């Protein structure tokens, strides 16, 4: 039967079995052979579609991780300047990057890193700027923020400006 990995922690995977098979959740481990064949970064992660074999009423074993259509990877520094890719999530449609307009101010360098990770993993990236009401339009930082937002929009990144106070 097939399912969706909802959570992956310390070698245990919470898998929601497809509705056709009952739609319940199982606590699963990877089949030993699968662990040996795959690198750490390629093990099952949240969002993966998997082939599962039930071993009891509430437990199962993951036999296969099905093909991923998208993913988000975090690069980890390694020895001697090498890097390791740490798979964070799979089969994502959109990555919404949230950053505040102020307190703390938006960090374009960090936003850029997330956008690159999204692009490399075939995920659509977008930016949500929060606390927009907290920055007065005539504040010096507001001009910088407007320029930054305009730059992202110019390169095709959707940007949403929000405010919990005003409902924007």
Where are these regions (language model features)?
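N-terminal accessory targeting/assembly segments
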Residues: 1-108
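Structural and coupling elements of P-loop NTPases
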Residues: 2, 45, 95, 122-123, ...
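Residue-level signal for inorganic ion chemistry
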Residues: 47, 118, 130
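Canonical P-loop GTPase G-domain recognition
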Residues: 124, 134-168
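Histidine-anchored nucleotide/phosphate-binding helix
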Residues: 109-119
């Amino acid at each position: 039967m097939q399912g969706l990995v909802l959570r992956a922690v310390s070698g245990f995977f919470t898998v929601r079995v497809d509705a056709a098979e009952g739609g319940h959740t199982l606590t699963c481990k990877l089949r030993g052979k699968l662990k040996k064949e795959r690198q750490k970064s390629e093990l099952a992660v949240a969002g993966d579609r998997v082939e599962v074999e039930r071993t009891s009423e509430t437990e199962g074993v993951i036999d296969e991780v099905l093909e991923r259509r998208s993913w988000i990877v975090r690069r980890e520094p390694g020895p001697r300047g090498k890097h390791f890719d740490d798979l964070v999530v799979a089969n994502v449609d959109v990555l919404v990057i949230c950053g505040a307009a102020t307190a703390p101010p938006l960090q374009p360098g960090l936003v850029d890193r997330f956008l690159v990770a999204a692009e490399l993993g075939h995920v659509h990236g977008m930016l949500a700027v929060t606390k927009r009401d907290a920055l007065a339009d005539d504040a010096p930082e507001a001009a910088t923020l407007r320029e930054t937002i305009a730059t992202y929009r110019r390169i095709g990144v959707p940007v949403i400006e929000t405010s919990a106070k005003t409902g924007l």
